[in-house]
């Protein structure tokens, strides 16, 4: 997801996006064209400031370098995923939650819609796989921490957990059990979704005992 080789097909510009992730690590993507950036985000096209040498830069706070590169892919290509439309891939959640967070931060509804669509798609896809994606717990933590104002993201993740709780043996997953046992509202939120899906007012025994 962090491959920038697609930029080789475009004229080189003078704009650099500097990315700083939540851990303070800094990376960058150079050679961006201001006119291309402006086509999908007038804000990001205007925001980079020129220096005396005629070079422009903009620093963005991102959850990961991959999320920053995903933004650049979207600005250039109109999408940020690498897979073709008919290509089946292993589902993953975290990158799409991170891109959604970035899209919200820069007020880019088109990118936010794409990211939310990818999160929904991967959640639906993951149910048919034999095990849950490795980034499930990381994504739950990220959504609760950074996207509480976007309820659709949390709803998507909770519905996946309820739908696959038994088949993916989440009650036996050490990381999931640890999160369920320490998080303020995960179990109660899962119980609400369980009831909304018509599985009863209370969670199944495996869900009630997820922390044991």
Where are these regions (language model features)?
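N-terminal BTB/POZ boundary and linker segment
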Residues: 1-36, 62, 66, 73-94, ...
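Short helix-loop-helix/strand-helix junction enriched in hydrophobic and basic residues
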Residues: 33-45
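Alpha-helix initiation and N-capping motif
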Residues: 41, 68, 133, 183-187
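Cytochrome P450 catalytic domain signature, combining two hallmark sequence patches
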Residues: 42-56, 81
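Generic N-terminal leader/targeting and pre-domain segments
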Residues: 58-60
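Post-BTB helical module
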Residues: 66-172
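Eukaryote-biased recognition of C-terminal alpha-helical segments
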Residues: 173-212
